[in-house]
Amino acid sequence: MIVSEFSKAQIALACWRSAKTETHLVMLSVCQVFMNRTKAGWYDGDLYENCIRWLAEFPGEFPDLRDPQFQQLLTNLETVTSGMVQDKTDGALWFIPTNQIGKSLSSQFSVTTTIGGLSFIK
């Protein structure tokens, strides 16, 4: 294994854990949030560092490698990380399950979009 493969694996794991009950499209949208954080300079503008810090804060389980949604995430991840696709989150820096958005949160931040069961905010 080479360093870039390990890095991509950690990025994929962070995206999967963030939206494991969602489709791969939601997982890829989460990847876009990590990309937006990177562009904003979080953790010295390092995508890998953004993802592993998130994984450390939110430890959890691991995907079933036979899961078709996880396989689609792996297949399409590089199109997001290389900047080949448009940001469907409109610059969001955070994501949250839509059913957890309260009035205090919605008054402090703006929801940029909702994809699947997640709302994307900035």
Regions found by a protein language model. Give the residues of each.
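Bacterial extracytoplasmic/cell-wall-associated proteins, especially those involved in peptidoglycan
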Residues: 2-122
